């Protein structure tokens, strides 16, 4: 099951499949499918994960066994998304507000001084592009992430806010255009 959903959702599906005599494997796709296609990194978990990894490897795919319990592969993907998609949402909120306030260059300079190892304009343009192109799907995933975090007994504020930002940028319908940060910010702001 390669759906991007909460571990508890996968566990419920596994119970149904097992009751019918099937073998369920939790599969998480860990990077964009394009351009790697079938060579995209995969995590598999559950009691049949090793058997699935053997079959997937024979198909020239890139599986890695994440554990013997259904939900482990999905938990890794979901919790990684708190960070990856959350950084995208922080980028959008920070730089859209900075652009609207007329202080975008100063904010980027401050970020660059704090973290000189990151090319902030390029990374920010990339993060916005990912949200504009994939925001609707990522928002749905982030709602599953929020359910994962809640099931762990923790507040889901960051994940829920990330889902809202992903939805918001997707709903603008703005085309990413060239990888020019200022122009990309302007295209989004014009539609908010």
Specify the residue positions occupied by each region the protein language model found:
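Generic structural hydrophobic/aromatic packing signal, biased to beta-strands
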Residues: 42, 162, 188-191
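Rossmann-fold dinucleotide-binding core
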Residues: 4-85
């Amino acid at each position: 099951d390669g759906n991007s959903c909460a571990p508890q959702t996968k566990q419920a599906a596994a119970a149904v499949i097992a009751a019918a005599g099937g073998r369920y494997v939790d599969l998480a796709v860990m990077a964009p499918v394009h351009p790697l296609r079938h060579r995209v990194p995969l995590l598999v978990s559950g009691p049949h994960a090793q058997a699935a990894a053997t079959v997937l490897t024979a198909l020239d795919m890139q599986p890695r066994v994440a554990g013997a319990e259904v939900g482990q592969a999905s938990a890794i993907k979901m919790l990684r998304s708190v960070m990856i998609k959350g950084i995208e949402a922080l980028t959008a909120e920070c730089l859209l507000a900075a652009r609207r306030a007329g202080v975008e260059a100063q904010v980027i300079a401050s970020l660059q001084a704090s973290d000189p190892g990151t090319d902030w304009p390029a990374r920010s343009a990339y993060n916005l592009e990912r949200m504009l192109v994939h925001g609707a799907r990522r928002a749905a995933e982030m709602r599953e992430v929020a359910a994962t975090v809640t099931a762990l007994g923790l507040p889901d504020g960051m994940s829920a806010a990330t889902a809202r930002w992903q939805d918001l940028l997707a709903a603008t319908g703005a085309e990413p255009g060239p990888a020019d940060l200022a122009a990309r910010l302007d295209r989004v702001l014009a539609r908010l």
